Regions:
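Residue-level recognition of short, solvent-exposed, well-ordered loop/turn junctions
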Residues: 218, 224-225
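C-terminal helix/juxtamembrane-tail motif
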Residues: 234, 320-335
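Cytochrome P450 heme-thiolate "Cys pocket" and heme-binding signature region
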Residues: 131, 181, 255-291, 315-317
Length: 335
């Protein structure tokens, strides 16, 4: 997911999942640093501000880890910018660039006079990286975990993929069937399965807002300027008042019309996985598209079995990752 997010952003492939000739893998420093940022950010919500600010001044504990992580991420951003510059020759892209027809996000910012400040540019790029990597990379394990517990739902998804697969020609005998974004676009049930996962396991489980001025909430609570409001999206997705008595069940049909052919309207302020209103995630449809193509390709080509004995639980972090990872067995399907 790190490479998937970085390639369209920087116009170059970091190659974190590539192997060298000695079969060793490149260091995952930047990816690990992002995990640290999210974990320390969560810790800041659990302890008094005076405590973490003191640790920051003394450069100890979690704040020391955060400072190191920021250094790693800044170095990564600088390296990617330099690498992007190398593959641009006389204003033209060379063969190593991301796409001959589409400009990568980094290039658009470099050409924007409002982003001449390197610190601002680094901050914006890393924000894109965090959002692009974590939304997809965090959600997919939960998607496959839920689907593995519900084989009937997997059967429905495969039945909807079947007519699409019958029209596609595999690259070679025995090759995997790869689904493209256009193939999965009409699959509303698959989208519903993703949304149902995000309801129960939102990639960002908490939403933090700072009050700008004195106001009274619709609930009647008075808030003052400077107050911090924490919204638990994880809890909201499991509230009976919002989602009904079966709120803890994994049921994609709850997102569909009675005939199952269209997606039912659900207000964004009720389903905040992609935020709401003017702050709704601009990359929402891109993230959904990428997840649909990945899930469709995996489910069509493989049976996914969860390895027994592992403890499935979330990590204490601003991102709802699986604490112990997710181990599965993939068995090639006989098609």
């Amino acid at each position: 997911m790190f490479d998937l997010a970085a390639t369209p952003l920087f116009g170059v492939d970091p190659g974190l999942l590539s192997f060298s000739l000695d079969m060793s893998m490149p260091p995952m420093d930047a990816a690990a640093a992002m995990d640290t940022v999210m974990e320390v950010g969560f810790i800041r919500h659990l302890i008094p501000a005076s405590c973490w600010k003191a640790m920051r001044r003394l450069n100890i504990g979690s704040e020391r880890k955060l400072r190191t992580a920021h250094t790693v991420l800044r170095r990564f951003a600088v390296e990617m910018i330099e690498e992007r510059s190398k593959i641009t020759l006389n204003g033209r892209r060379c063969a190593l660039s991301y796409d001959d027809e589409h400009e990568d996000i980094l290039s658009s910012y470099i050409n924007d006079p409002d982003y001449t400040d390197n610190d601002l540019l680094h901050a914006v790029l890393l924000s894109f990286m965090l959002v692009g990597r974590d939304t997809i990379g965090t959600t997919l394990p939960w998607v496959f975990y839920n689907l593995a517990q519900n084989p009937g739902i997997v059967s429905i998804i495969r039945s909807q993929l079947s007519p699409i697969a019958s029209r596609k020609v595999p690259a070679s005998m025995g090759a995997m069937m790869i689904f493209e974004p256009e193939d999965t676009k009409p699959l509303v049930y698959l989208r519903a399965a993703l949304y149902e996962t995000l309801r129960l396991y939102p990639s960002a489980p908490i939403e933090r807002k700072t009050v700008a001025a004195v106001d009274i909430m619709p609930s009647g609570h008075e808030v003052k300027a400077g107050d911090t409001i924490l919204i638990s999206l994880h809890s909201m997705g499991r509230m009976e008042d919002l989602w009904g008595k079966d709120c803890l069940d994994y049921n994609p049909n709850s997102w569909l019309s009675k005939d199952g052919n269209t997606q039912r309207y659900v207000p964004s302020h009720k389903f905040l996985a992609f935020n709401s209103g003017s702050r709704i995630c601009p990359g929402k449809e891109i993230a959904v598209m990428q997840m649909k193509t990945i899930v469709a390709t995996v489910l069509w080509n493989f049976d996914v079995e969860v390895v027994e004995g592992q403890i499935i639980q979330p990590k204490p972090s601003c991102i709802l990752q699986m604490k112990n990872g997710f181990i599965v067995k993939l068995r090639k399907r006989e098609l």
